[in-house]
């Protein structure tokens, strides 16, 4: 299977391409800086905010996994909550559109647990109301990720022909290939 993974220098993307290669898939990745690379991945160098680049890289792919995200650290999310909204909305919108018009069979969107509202003492399941406000600290990021999920619903349930879309909402991930520098890392690595 030909699989494109965006965000291959990040924690989830890097580990995912390693696994996909191990499973025998033909793996392609995107890179926008001189970031770390995985041997065996064919890389496209460019900017996912460029629609022509998105069209070029999705052409001929069976699956596109969007692990890319304009991120920094938890402190930035609190101090400058809008810093990541516009770049991520542009990338998410263009990548799913390019995937659809390129005939990609399956699109996987890596969302975030920031979409959930505060739950207090109750457990949250899939029946929660998506229009409840996200946790206040992650309000901007939560709504931005929710918009990506709404796009997935549009392309998989509202259009004909449709494109199979999967939404994954990881929690506070950490592990090999994560950012461990306190000034750049997310909450979990910062506490370790």
Can you say where each PLM-predicted feature lies in the sequence?
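Flexible, glycine-rich beta-alpha linker
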Residues: 115-117, 139-140, 163-188
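N-terminal Rossmann NAD(P)H-binding glycine-rich loop of SDR-like oxidoreductase domains
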Residues: 3-23
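NAD(P)H-binding glycine-rich loop region in Rossmannoid oxidoreductase-like domains
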Residues: 35, 45-88, 101
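Conserved Rossmann-fold NAD(P)-dependent oxidoreductase catalytic core, especially the SDR/UDP-sugar
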Residues: 66, 93-138, 158, 163-166
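Active-site Tyr-X1-5-Lys
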Residues: 136-169, 192
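Conserved catalytic-core motifs of eukaryotic protein kinase domains, centered on the activation segment
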Residues: 74-82, 118-123, 177-180
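Short alpha-helix in the Rossmann-fold core of NAD(P)-dependent oxidoreductases
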Residues: 84-92, 108-111, 144-145
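Conserved glycine-rich Rossmann-like NAD(P)H-binding loop of the short-chain dehydrogenase/reductase
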Residues: 25-32
